């Protein structure tokens, strides 16, 4: 698994932005601190609450969510689910799970990515990583606390 101190891998994938435009999303699109989070599938019941929670981080960092579902699925889900209709960050299609495979966060039995969160600095170096089981949601407030501590620096 790619971890703390390593560079986050470059990606060029399709996604849906906060205005529901579909297009190419790359690592270069994100400046400064970044929170990249991965979730198993669109149209599930845990994921919308996590996505809505992660949206509160957009004032602190660039935020982007990833799953293996395609961009058309993401757009349909955004339009269908009130919790994520108005999010202010992109959802990206890691079709084929190439990025998830490179990060080594794929559950081989289920064929989906784990619930992983990466906090990445302005130099694209991973400063924090956490990976949860498929059925265990994340706490966006804890991600925010970790992000703020990392941005503050020092011990």
Regions found by a protein language model. Give the residues of each.
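Chalcogenol-based redox active-site neighborhoods
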Residues: 1-155
């Amino acid at each position: 698994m790619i971890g703390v101190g390593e560079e986050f891998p470059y990606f060029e994938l399709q996604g849906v932005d906060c205005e529901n435009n579909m297009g190419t999303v790359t690592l270069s699109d994100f400046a400064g601190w970044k929170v990249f989070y991965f979730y198993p599938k669109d149209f599930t019941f845990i994921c919308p609450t996590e996505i809505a929670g992660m949206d509160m981080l957009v004032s602190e960092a660039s935020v982007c969510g990833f799953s293996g579902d395609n961009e058309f699925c993401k757009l349909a889900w955004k339009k269908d689910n009130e919790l994520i209709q108005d999010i202010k960050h992109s959802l990206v299609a890691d079709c084929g799970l190439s990025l998830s495979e490179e990060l080594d966060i794929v559950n081989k039995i289920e064929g989906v990515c784990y619930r992983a969160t990466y906090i990445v600095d302005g130099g694209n170096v991973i400063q924090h990583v956490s990976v949860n089981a498929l059925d265990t949601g994340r706490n966006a407030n804890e991600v925010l606390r970790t992000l703020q501590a990392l941005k503050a620096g020092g011990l």
